[in-house]
Amino acid sequence: MSITNVMNQGMTRRGFVGASVIACLAAAGLVSFAGEAHADGAQTRTVTDARGEVEIPANPQRIVDLSGNSDMLKIFGFDVVGTANSDAYDYTKFPAYLEEDLAGATILGYSYQDTMDIEAILALDPDLIIISGVQEKMYDQLQSVCPTIMIQLAQINWKEDVQAFAKVLDCEDKATAWLESYEAKAAAMGEKIRAEYGEDTTYLSFLASGGQLYIFDAAGFGMVMYEDMGLAKPEGMPQQENVSLPVVDYEGLAAIDADFIFAIGTDEDLKALNESKPYQMMRAVQDGNVVELPASPYFNQGYGCIGKDTLVSEFPYLIAGEDPAEARVKARKDMAEESADTEATDADDKQDEGAADDKSSSETAGKTK
């Protein structure tokens, strides 16, 4: 499936589905979950998905994810053995922001493909397979291999989607902790950017593709800037009701008055953009405040959890004009340090809790004597 088909499949707020955005039926109260202990001691959970009840491992170890949500599984603490979270422009590789997190997983295709190689899936010996409605026609065949659950795709609220998916795998606490950490990080980065570049400075991001401009408003890159980081939108944004990725021509783009522009596209599309007279007249272009980014991976990066997190970390380097590849290296280093700090804090908290419990036990024992 081409990137144009992906964009054509979802232009409205309700219809646009990023490669890594899901909402399971649990969000609407249509999925039920019940833990069940077998006589042999094996722990399972019963999930009622769009196709009926499925008994799945309580702690799956070999997940094959075809739904495009392997990044969510990663933040829940699962390592997938097979994935369809491939690059939107090259299905044989991972998007750059997922290379480290999905290292070792086998790429089985792209999440918008309705069929994938069943033999390749079998070879991975999965104990749980996760699909979206896109792959529904494979459901019965996959169910004969191992427990398979189908996640219904929709865009409602990405944070609720994360929690709903976490509920399926009984890891809501991890999802909540990650979301709280991300929200705090994005807000802090927004404050840092506003302090350095001005409270009222405005930012615009768009994808140039085939002579059309897809404006990231309430989706992707734009959602990260406006909703997560709290940066200001420019005047002249296209008003298209219930559309999160509005499409404009060059004249429509030139009507948007932004202080900074993030132009995303292939080399060919960016060349055509730079040759456009209306684009050349934009204030940000004339001021030299344009950051050009490759379509792979930045078209999709603002949709998934890890992509969003990485983009927030990259932002100060990108806006300063650093090469995107170098910005990613520095961002990943920053993220590794953040993770280490969090782990150290968690360890200290557990140690303090343990000491408090020991003290309480000692005091109780003393009173008993």
What would you call each of these model-derived segments?
Residues 62-76, 177-232:
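Basic- and aromatic-lined ligand-binding clefts that recognize polyanionic substrates
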Residues 118, 122-131, 147, 258-259:
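Proline-aspartate-enriched helix->loop->beta-strand connector
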Residues 66-120:
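A short, structured surface patch at a secondary-structure boundary
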Residues 10, 33-46, 53, 364-368:
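C-terminal segment of N-terminal export signals and the immediately downstream linker at the start
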Residues 53, 138-210, 302-346:
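Extracytoplasmic substrate-binding proteins
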Residues 123, 140, 256-369:
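Structured C-terminal subdomain patch of bacterial secreted/periplasmic proteins
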Residues 1-11, 15-31:
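N-terminal secretory signal peptides
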Residues 49-51, 109-118, 240-250:
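Short helix-initiation/N-cap motifs at beta->coil->alpha
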